[in-house]
Amino acid sequence: MRDVQSERDERNVPLKHVGIKNLKYPVVVLDKKNKNQHTIAEINMYVDLPKDFRGTHMSRFLEVLNKFHLKIDPKNIKAILDDLKKTLKAQSASIEIMFPYFLQKKAPVTKIESYMEYKCGFKAYDTNEECEFYIVVEVPIQTLCPCSKEISKYNAHNQRALARIEVETSELIWFEDLIELAESSASVPLFTLLKRPDEKYVTEKAYENPKFVEDVARDIALSLKENKKIRWFKVEVESFESIHNHNAYACVNSDTMEV
């Protein structure tokens, strides 16, 4: 049977990334409290393609992924990339995995437990020289505007925001620890279930702890800078403004911080 993908391409244009994108796939990830958590990931997998090959073999990406029996952790991700390079005869391989991650969270006053959803994941890029591994968390939080509080007699505008943390590391860093860092840097964390005493606490806590997105980004960055496991990091904070028809945004990475 004719193998069109392997035929020679005369245009002599190498491609940096070819592969599959937005694959929905069941996975098992490490959970700090419960050891494992089942979830559904969205996965991108790529390899490079030499200038003289017409196309890659898309089915082989799934064949490689299926070998690992749904288990996704830092050790397996390195093995997946090695297998991709070997199977597809590539010089480089990369994978991006994002998934909903759930933690049981107690309301601040009543202590009623409910599940809180976060978006977490891994990114890894493997070339012949080295393998770069990243952990990603996206944490919903709340911010209350310091300026609004200062100039207003009765209240201050507040809103949900999203803190996104990406760290490069060669060691295990728990999602839970990065999530806790983001929440502790906000005006107040978010909760799925709140009774009236909890709602009173959250409202007053935010008012007592006003923060700009710039404040949140800087506080997270300073804490990440102290973590010796982290080689590089990037922090993004986006606030979904309640009184504006636009969002507020702040970003910092370790390259731009003073040593």
Curated annotation (Swiss-Prot):
The keyword Hydrolase applies. InterPro entries: GTP_cyclohydrolase_FolE2, GTP_cyclohydrolase_FolE2/MptA. Pathway: Cofactor biosynthesis; 7,8-dihydroneopterin triphosphate biosynthesis; 7,8-dihydroneopterin triphosphate from GTP: step 1/1. The record marks C145 as: May be catalytically important. GO terms for biological process: tetrahydrofolate biosynthetic process. The keyword Glycosyltransferase does not apply. It holds the Pfam family GCHY-1. It is an enzyme of class 3 (hydrolase). Belongs to the GTP cyclohydrolase IV family. This is GTP cyclohydrolase FolE2. It comes from Thermosipho africanus (strain TCF52B). The gene is folE2.
